[in-house]
Amino acid sequence: MSATLADDSVFVSALGLNTEDMKNIITPENANDIGDRLIIFPKYVNSDISEIEIKEKIEKIAEKYNVVILVPSFSRAKFWDERGIRTATKDNIDKIVAALKSGKHVGKIIFVNRYDGIDLPGDACRMLVIDGLPPLNSIKDRYIQSVAPQSTVLLREQVQRIEQGMGRGIRSNDDECCIVLMGDELTDVLSRNRGIDYFSVATRCQYDLSKQLWD
């Protein structure tokens, strides 16, 4: 729930709490259940790098480690897995998750759109790729997107969805995972629209530390 509640204004909009209620929300003093994440943003580092080049580097890493790739659609999944043999579906997702958690080398696996509730700790996922902007699922968010695409409310929701995806590969404070962010729409939200400013404190700290390594 940490990513879901990073923006506590949801308590006002969804639960109808007032200002006094907001002052009494129980908040942890730290987020020491979050492991180490190296966050890589290839297009931010080098705007000339192509998606094919990024893909080739990631697939090389997948020869040794388990790499999970989150995409917004099955059409985008084909970029990574043209034959569809490494893409999770409703029919095989439980089997794939079990294989990843077994500790064995599985390699590259693609999850499409819905991945809430999927936890991939340790060797189950050593690199997690978010390729593209996660879709907004609620009717309210889709309405806001249609009438006010530059809305701050919408931007916060989009960043929240990105953070939820980032959390799939790291589940405890002694876990570690490399996060790769890619895709034009995702780049627009995080970079051009300053979505990075809406990361939770812990994620922003890890992002800033990672950025020092690429700069």
Which functions belong to the PLM regions below?
Residues V71-S75, T87-L100, F111-D116:
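Conserved helicase motor
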Residues F11-E20, R83-A88, A124-L128, R142-A148, ...:
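Short secondary-structure boundary/capping segments
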Residues T4-K60:
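Interdomain hinge/linker at the junction between the two RecA-like core domains of SF2 helicases
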Residues M1, Y65-I69, V106-I109, I179:
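Generic beta-sheet signal
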Residues N66, S75-R76, S172-D215:
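Long, largely alpha-helical accessory region at the distal end of helicase-like NTP-driven motors
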Residues E20-I26, E82-V97:
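Conserved RecA-like helicase motor-core motifs
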Residues L5, I61-R83:
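Conserved strand-helix element at the start of the C-terminal RecA-like helicase core
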Residues Y44-V45, A99-D188:
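Conserved RecA-like P-loop NTPase helicase motor core
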